[in-house]
Amino acid sequence: MSNAKEKVSMVSLGCPKNLVDAEVMLGRLAKDRYEITTDEREADIIIVNTCSFIKEAKQESIDTILDLADRKQDGRCRLLIVTGCLPQRYQEELARELPEVDIFVGTGDYPRIAEIIEEKSSRPEQLRYIGDPNFVFDESLTRLNSSPAYTAYLKIAEGCSNCCSYCVIPSLRGAFRSRPLESVLAEARSLVAGGAREINLIAQDITTYGRDLPGAPSLETLIRELAAIDGLAWIRLLYAYPDGITDGLIQTIKNEPKVCKYLDLPIQHISDPILKRMNRRSTEPQIRELVARLREEIPDIALRTSLIVGFPGETEEDFRTLLHFVEEAQFDRLGVFCYSREEGTPAAEMPDQVSERVKRERYKKLMKAQARVSFKRNRRLIDTEEQVIVEGYSEETELLLKGRSSRQAPDIDGQVYITAGNANVGDIVRLRITDSSDYDLIGEIIS
């Protein structure tokens, strides 16, 4: 009898929050009798961790599943497993349309992945495990960080209790629930012990952290406790809803040296009629005042936001207001999404749906405007000094190192190309910025 471990490969789609879920499953499997591989061709078991937030994400998930189903026919793979938001939302349809899939697992059953695979050995039929989405990771579970060792995402809460009219997340992930403070700190210490220099805090809305816990510890309290961990250099804040940003949080970002002077601030729109239809809690004056206050208190802060164009009822006037705001507010980074009409949401039933053609036109105009803004913002950094974490060699040439400044989040922002000086992967060095493009920087190591 062979004692060889079965090999498992994971494909994780969607946002960093999904990636952490995938890492939880990999950690559970690695702790059991499975070997993890990044090569699907040599895997006995392939898991696709899916996203279904918007139409494009759903299509990417389906395309990936079908592609891997073909590989299952041709290769050594014996089990194809689909996990995450897509089966949580569409279990009946998927089971009917994708007979190639052996197991579907929803967002509440990640820790049971090893037991689920074991159960399949005695049950030849297609299996579905779609329970209530109430899972919350804690430090007693093993998580296999798939990012480079020097950086990690740290999920501080699960779910969402906001009721944005376009969003399906609450139905897929459940109500907002914070992890206990000590649980978050214990995982952070473990990540740092494993080599992490940078920790990126994530949740559906990090500003809500702690309000549901005994004693209601604030996000500021969590940040200060994290900053006390020896060996941790950077703390980055992602997904901070504007209505939850307090003066205390602004002062913590300003005064705590380990906190990156960077804030991801998803505003979605600026026109009050659209914000109201979206069921967002912020208004145009409040958003404008917040951006001004952040820039006044922390002049060197890098601000990122995300916007939706083509929301039902968005008029030309609404869009012009948004376009002018993007030009005025001068966000350093900006992501734009065309509104996706998601069944089961209030927005899907609203009148005055905007055509796909108009959505694409508005998307292009907004991205063109932001390219000009980003170019201008980056030019201002020439001849300044930036801290940069070194990530390896450029894809174009091994003569050029690359990295990210504290103003650039992993995966979603630009890079810094290093033209002079030597450093190791994971080092944090000081660079003098010598040139820039729309989204990237170029510099030389000075220390």
From Swiss-Prot:
Iron listed as a keyword: yes
Describe its function.
Answer: Catalyzes the methylthiolation of an aspartic acid residue of ribosomal protein uS12.
Supply the enzyme class, top level.
transferase
Q: Which PANTHER family match?
A: RIBOSOMAL PROTEIN S12 METHYLTHIOTRANSFERASE RIMO (PTHR43837), RIBOSOMAL PROTEIN US12 METHYLTHIOTRANSFERASE RIMO (PTHR43837:SF1)
Q: What is its main location?
A: cytoplasm
Print the organism lineage: Bacteria, Pseudomonadati, Thermodesulfobacteriota, Desulfuromonadia, Geobacterales
Stored HAMAP family? MTTase_RimO
Please provide one cellular component term from the Gene Ontology annotations of this protein. Answer: cytosol
A GO molecular-function annotation: aspartic acid methylthiotransferase activity
Q: Which UniProt keywords apply?
A: 4Fe-4S, Cytoplasm, Iron, Iron-sulfur, Metal-binding, S-adenosyl-L-methionine, Transferase
One Pfam family of this chain: TRAM_2
| Domain TRAM per the UniProt entry, residue ranges | 379-447
Q: Which cofactor does it need?
A: [4Fe-4S] cluster
Name its species: Geobacter sulfurreducens (strain ATCC 51573 / DSM 12127 / PCA)
PROSITE patterns, from UniProt?
Answer: MTTASE_N (PS51449), MTTASE_RADICAL (PS01278), RADICAL_SAM (PS51918), TRAM (PS50926)
Please give a single GO biological process term from the UniProt record.
tRNA modification
Domain named Radical SAM core is located at 146-376
Q: Which residues bind [4Fe-4S] cluster 1?
A: 15, 51, 85
Which residues participate in [4Fe-4S] cluster 2 binding? 160, 164, 167
Tell me the ranges covered by the MTTase N-terminal domain, including all copies: 6-122
Assigned EC number: 2.8.4.4
What name does the UniProt record give this protein?
Answer: Ribosomal protein uS12 methylthiotransferase RimO
Name the domain of life this protein comes from. Bacteria
Keyword Iron present in the record's keywords: the answer is: yes
What is this enzyme's catalytic activity, as reactions? Answer: L-aspartate(89)-[ribosomal protein uS12]-hydrogen + (sulfur carrier)-SH + AH2 + 2 S-adenosyl-L-methionine = 3-methylsulfanyl-L-aspartate(89)-[ribosomal protein uS12]-hydrogen + (sulfur carrier)-H + 5'-deoxyadenosine + L-methionine + A + S-adenosyl-L-homocysteine + 2 H(+)
Subcellular localization, per the record? Cytoplasm
Q: How is the cofactor bound?
A: Binds 2 [4Fe-4S] clusters. One cluster is coordinated with 3 cysteines and an exchangeable S-adenosyl-L-methionine.
